[in-house]
């Protein structure tokens, strides 16, 4: 029997997928929702009494808004329009490190950058206290950096219980992403895959795939630096049309009539 168009129920959005023609850019597996809005300009033609006789539509435009449950570094990379720097044992990246060290304890500082240490007392209520300098040994006014044993020893100040230590380190595993004021994201393909249910066949899932051939991400981003359930990250942008193509396709919707695992 030939497939017939009709009502379908979107059960949930599985993921989003960004790519160029030759390279996958990111996968968003924690999308909580996505909305595609297509709007158009219109011109109303009315008679002498103001009655609407005809409405002419032109100039379609599209906007995409999606929400990811967590911060996604691949999306930040796409928005920043710069390749992320990936740290490895052969390509270390100097990164700032912050540690709270309790009095009487030591800190492993393997791969730390020498002479990059800044040490302050840290009170129980979180305020910064006196600053300390580097010395040949830990004293009431100095801290010790052992470059041979790769150990940091905090001051022996009897008035303090903990210290905030900032230093730089050659990191071998991690990434550095940079958002610059003069760089903007490029257009790429965007896909969404959702699981759909036929209203007459509840419990049987089908794949619904949305393809946007030219998606321009917005460089605007909000990074929620907090715990709890408010770590969402919005991802939005515009749908572009190709002025040099005979086809002005904006969005393609594929409904795959084959059963999918939930």
Show where each model-derived region lies:
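Signature of extracytoplasmic/envelope-associated structural regions
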Residues: 1-262
């Amino acid at each position: 029997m030939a497939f017939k168009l009709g009502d379908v129920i979107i059960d949930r959005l599985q993921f989003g997928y960004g790519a160029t023609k030759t390279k996958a850019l990111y996968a968003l597996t924690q999308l909580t929702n996505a909305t595609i809005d297509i709007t158009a300009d219109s011109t109303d033609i009315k008679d002498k009494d103001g009655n609407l006789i005809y409405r002419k539509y032109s100039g379609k435009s599209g906007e995409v808004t999606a929400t990811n449950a967590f911060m996604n570094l691949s999306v930040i990379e796409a928005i920043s329009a710069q390749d992320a720097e990936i740290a490895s044992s052969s390509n270390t990246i100097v990164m700032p490190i912050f540690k709270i060290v309790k009095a009487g304890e030591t800190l492993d500082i393997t791969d730390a950058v020498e002479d990059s240490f800044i040490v302050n007392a840290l009170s129980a209520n979180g305020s910064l206290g006196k600053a300390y300098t580097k010395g040949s040994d830990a004293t009431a006014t100095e801290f010790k950096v052992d470059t041979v044993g790769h150990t940091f020893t905090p001051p022996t100040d009897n008035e303090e219980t903990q210290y905030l230590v900032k230093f730089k380190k050659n990191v071998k595993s991690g990434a550095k992403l940079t958002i610059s004021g003069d760089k903007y994201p490029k257009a790429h393909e965007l896909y969404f895959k959702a699981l759909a249910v036929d209203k007459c066949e509840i419990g049987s899932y089908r794949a619904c795939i949305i393809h946007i051939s030219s998606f321009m991400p917005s460089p605007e981003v909000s990074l929620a630096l907090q715990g709890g359930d408010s770590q969402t990250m919005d991802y939005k942008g515009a749908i572009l049309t190709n002025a040099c193509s005979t086809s002005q396709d904006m969005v393609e919707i594929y409904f795959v009539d084959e059963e999918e695992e939930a």
